Amino acid sequence: MVLVSTRALLLSRRGLHARWSSNAASSSLSDETQASTVGEFASADIEECNSRYRGILQISDAEGKGRGLFASKQFAPDELIMSAKAVAVSDVRGSHSVQTGWDKHVVMDLPGILINHSCDANVGIRDNDVGAYDFFAIKNIKKGEELVWDYNASEWEISTPFQCACGSARCRGLLRGFKHDSMHVRRSYEPFYASYLKQNDQ
């Protein structure tokens, strides 16, 4: 059976070995812990997810990025696309995690974990009641278009900044986290970024 790696493998295929940090956490979940928590997505997992979201979303190959998530229908600005659920929670960062609080890092379920980064995102996030994020369209999205979000909209500080390879004309080059890019995130995505980061704006 063919196994498809998780979000960390997607990053590594692009040479993006990102690690995330909060303002306090300094250690990361081990790769072994992450692997046992997340596992690897078998083709059957992908097929089941695509069946569940048929006519709405599709996990497919994203050129140069491994797997990605694509729209199977049009979405209008502010329209809810999907809700991601936290399947693992920690107070330290991990290679598969996204940050939802100052000392809270979660691993999302499929298909949210496979949404790639872009500096010109078409998707924004809001906190939800299942421990992760709801994903909303922040511009008109056409059928067949890849859904992408800006990782700086959730990560306070990327402890190992990395060179972005999104290919967007608006690519900012080096990704370092909201701490170093707050003006752009607020201007581009308000109100669709992590709630805990908005507390820092006050």
Regions found by a protein language model. Give the residues of each.
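Conserved catalytic SET/PR domain of SAM-dependent protein methyltransferases, capturing the structural core
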Residues: 2-202
